């Protein structure tokens, strides 16, 4: 029986035309691809989502390990190749669609992908902005600079802080540009994302916490006492300092996730609701 693709019914790509985003670099090193699949530690019980499947270098290996593979690709030429390569794998579904227009699986799922660099941040937001989703863990190859921003101990960005309240994000190792075709201008990194078993906050608090994070990280280099004084009274700040075991000069961008949980819980317990900072509305892809 001929396998059906789930076609994105939008603008069709002409022969020789590439997708409307740039930054897709295909991996050609078999050992590297095997390492990615091995590090993902997937089993027959897993549903795997691959974002930007390309010509299927990862897809075919994932098909042999996972119970279900959802391979997303927007390039018509690559979709044809993927369909042919996975014809003998009924557990693999090719989704012909723009990555940013898909609906995430409702069940628990794992992400194993070499993602297009140009949409790294939108992809991370899609996966991590809703900690109540089914996303459990992932091994994602991305541009090294982005990987370092997402894993830095000094946190400048409110979204990165919010993600890390519910997910552990770490660099497994760096990857040279020579392992890709066409080779990117910069090196890459293999990033592991894992849902925290004991997150310091309930996922229902995500939006409220993001508002706090945006307010406090307007100036990440600011001292703790300056960054939060618009929310807490002097007496509450004194209580916080004792709870966190820090002084007034502690830089707000260096606080840990557990310390942020204490700050958030103190706010929800002692600060009137109308004084809670609200999360700003952003356009898709902004961070």
UniProtKB/Swiss-Prot annotation:
Protein's UniProt keywords contain Methyltransferase: yes
Leading EC class: transferase
Any one of the GO BP annotations: response to antibiotic
Disulfide bonds: none
Pfam families: RrnaAD
PROSITE patterns the record matches: RRNA_A_DIMETH, SAM_RNA_A_N6_MT
Transmembrane parts of this sequence: none
A molecular function (GO) term: RNA binding
Keywords associated with the record: Antibiotic resistance, Methyltransferase, RNA-binding, S-adenosyl-L-methionine, Transferase
Gene3D superfamilies given in the database record: Ribosomal RNA adenine dimethylase-like, domain 2 (1.10.8.100), Vaccinia Virus protein VP39 (3.40.50.150)
Record keyword Transmembrane present: no
Sequence positions that bind S-adenosyl-L-methionine: 25, 27, 52, 73, 98, 114
Its EC number(s): 2.1.1.-
SUPFAM superfamilies reported in the protein's UniProt record: S-adenosyl-L-methionine-dependent methyltransferases
Annotated signal sequence range: none
Family according to the record: Belongs to the class I-like SAM-binding methyltransferase superfamily. rRNA adenine N(6)-methyltransferase family.
Function per UniProt: Involved in erythromycin resistance.
NCBIfam families in alphabetical order: Erm23S_rRNA_broad
Listed name of the protein: rRNA adenine N-6-methyltransferase
The encoding gene: ermK
């Amino acid at each position: 029986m001929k396998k059906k693709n789930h076609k994105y019914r939008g603008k069709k790509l002409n022969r020789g035309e590439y997708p409307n985003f740039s930054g897709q670099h295909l991996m050609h090193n078999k050992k590297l691809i095997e390492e990615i699949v091995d590090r993902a530690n997937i089993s027959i019980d897993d549903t795997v989502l691959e974002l930007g499947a390309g010509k299927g270098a990862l897809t075919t290996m994932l098909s042999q390990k996972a119970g279900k593979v959802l391979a997303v690709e927007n390039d018509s030429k690559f979709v044809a190749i993927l369909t042919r390569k996975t014809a003998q794998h009924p557990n693999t579904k090719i989704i012909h669609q723009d990555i940013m227009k898909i609906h995430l699986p409702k069940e628990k799922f794992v992400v194993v992908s070499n993602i297009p660099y140009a949409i790294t941040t939108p992809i991370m937001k899609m996966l991590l902005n809703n900690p109540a989703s089914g996303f459990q863990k992932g091994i994602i190859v991305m541009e090294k600079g982005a990987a370092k921003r997402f894993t830095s101990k000094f946190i400048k960005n409110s979204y990165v802080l919010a993600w890390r309240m519910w997910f552990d994000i770490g660099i497994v190792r760096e990857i040279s540009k020579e392992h890709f075709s066409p080779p990117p201008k910069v090196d890459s990194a293999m990033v592991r994302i894992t849902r925290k078993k004991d997150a310091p906050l309930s996922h229902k608090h995500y939006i409220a916490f993001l508002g706090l994070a945006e307010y406090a990280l307007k100036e990440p280099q600011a001292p703790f006492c300056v960054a939060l004084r618009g929310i807490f009274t002097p007496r509450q700040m004194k209580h916080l300092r004792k709870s966190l075991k820090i002084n007034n000069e502690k830089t707000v961008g260096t606080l840990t996730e557990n310390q942020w949980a204490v700050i958030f819980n103190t706010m929800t317990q002692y600060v009137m609701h109308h004084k809670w900072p609200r999360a700003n509305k952003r356009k898709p892809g902004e961070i």
